[in-house]
Amino acid sequence: VVESRLFDQRIRKNMVPTQEPVLGKTAGSAFGWRIDPFTGQSALHTGLDFQADTGTPILAAAGGVVVAQEVHPAYGNMVEIDHGNQLVTRYAHASRTFVKRGDLVRRGQKIAEVGTTGRSTGPHLHFEVLVQGVPQDPQKFLHAGAAGAATGTQVATKAAAPRR
């Protein structure tokens, strides 16, 4: 039983997006309401932007299965990874992608390179975390990763809880 629980904890740790997707880069534009740089109107920014040079590696924030690898009008070259438990990460504006739909990826695996494709003002990674299809603040997951895996799992569980 103890061995089974340890295995479950290890799986959860690797499947919750707590790994920094661009190493050594601080987040620029944060999650939340801001003035859209294209329209000049207030709009919800559904992710976290990491400014980096074109070609900088983009890493999977957690293990999972690639459910989308496409060119999107707004996101440009984009990858989405399903981590189970209705938890998905999105990586947008890539110059190149190295995975395809159906690929199994591990935490920290290089999946793409930073670019400025789609609706972008310069080279960066736009990183999103979606729980049950609803955008969440990725910073909460990344901070939880710095605090420890158990906390990351708690953040994912709390984000998935039904709202009243």
Predicted features and spans:
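Non-catalytic extracellular/periplasmic "stalk"
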Residues: 1-26, 30
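Catalytic cores of peptidoglycan-degrading enzymes
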Residues: 19-164
